[in-house]
Amino acid sequence: MGDQHVVTLANDSKGNPDEPLPALRWEEPPEGPVLVLLDQTRLPAEEVELVCTDVPALVEAIRGLAVRGAPVLGIAGAYGVALAAVRGYDVDDAAESLAHARPTAVNLAYGVRRALTAYRAALAGGGDPERAAAAALAEARSLHAEDEEASAAMARHGLQLLAELLPGGGYQILTHCNTGALVSGGEGTAFAVVLAAHRQGQLRRLWVDETRPLLQGARLTAYEAARTGMAYTLLTDSAAGSLFAAGNVHAVLIGADRIAADGSVANKVGSYPLAVLARYHNVPFIVVAPTTTVDQGTADGSSIEIEQRPGHEVTESAGNPVAPLGTQAYNPAFDITPAALITAIVTENGVVSPVTPDALAALCPSRAQGHDQALG
C-alpha cells in the first residue's frame, strides 16, 4: 500500500463555471514533490484530495477509481514516472506498475511511455538522475498542457459538427459516464462540447445517464453540470429507451477509453446499447476523444482487453447488500461499440465521419499503444 493522505476541501457544487475542476496537480512542498488528486470516489458528497507521495499510492488511486477517465490517466501516468524519478525510486519498476494499473484505457500507457522515454533519453545523453527526473517532469507537464489544448479544440470541432447535424440549436443531448474536467487536463471531451453549446445558448437540456454500477453520471457528470448552471436531468440507464422513443434525444455524446484502428470504441459499459438505440431512432451517435486514445496497434474491438471489475460493485450499494449473499455478478467496466454505429469521432485534429480505418489513420497519428506494447 502506498503513502497517501487526504485533505478535505470546502464543498461548493455551484463553483465558478469558468474554472474547470482540476482532477490533479503537481506540487513541490518542502517535504518533497507530490501528486495531488481530487478523489472522485468521494464526490459529490465531499471534495477530498489525495496526496500521493509515491507510485504505489498512485497505482492504488488509479485502480480504486479515485482518478479515472482516459485522458487524465495518461497525465497521471506521466506524473507518476516523474514522481518516481524525482524521489529516487526505481523508475522502470514504477513505469511497469503504472502502465498495468488498468488495462483498457490506452492513454495511461501512452503517458507512462512518454515520460519514461524522456527520462531514458536524458540518461543516455549523459545526464545525471536529477536531470533525467527533470526531463520526465517536463514531459508530464507538456502532456498536461497538450491535453488542455486538445480539450478546447475538441469543443470547437464538436460544436461545429452539432451545428451541421442539428441546425437551429436547442439541443437535447444524452451522455453516458463522465467526460468533463475530471477526466482531462482541460474541460473534458464530450462534456466540453456540451459546455460549449451551453455557453452559446444552444443547449436545451443535458440528459445524464446514472451509469451503473458506480454511478459516474449521477455522482460526477451531474456534479459538473450543476457547477455550470446548465439545464440537466438525471435518468436511470434503463430509461434511455423511453427517452429516445419520446423524441427527447437529439444527439448522444460519449467519450472513449480506447479507439481501435477500425474505429470501434471501448467506453464505459452501457455505451453500446445507446449506440444501438441511437441507430434505430436515427439519432447521431458521436464519440469525442483526443488522438492519444486512438490505438493504431489494436486492429479492432475484439482485440481490446476489457477490465472486469469486482462483483461487489453490483451486489452492494454503499456497502449494503442488494442481492443475496453469494450472488455472482457480471461486471465489465467497458463495452465495444462498432464503428458502423458511430456517426462521427471528434478529435482535436478534426472530425472523422464516416468512421473508416483510412479516415481515422489520416487524422490520428499512430502514437498510442496498449500497455503491453508501451514500455519496450
Regions found by a protein language model. Give the residues of each.
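Generic structural signal for well-ordered, non-membrane alpha-helical segments
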Residues: 51, 55-58, 70, 74, ...
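Histidine-anchored nucleotide/phosphate-binding helix
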Residues: 188-199, 275
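Conserved phosphate/anionic-ligand binding catalytic regions in large, soluble enzymes, centered on
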Residues: 64-77, 107-108, 178-186, 330-346
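Ligand-binding beta-strand-loop-alpha-helix segment within the catalytic cores
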Residues: 110-173, 202-204, 208-252
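Long amphipathic alpha-helical segments
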Residues: 5-6, 20-127
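Short beta-strand segments
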Residues: 38, 76-80, 111, 174-178, ...
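Conserved phosphate- and dinucleotide-binding cores of soluble alpha/beta proteins
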Residues: 203-204, 209-376
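Short, hydrophobic/aliphatic alpha-helical segments
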Residues: 50-66, 89, 167, 171-175, ...
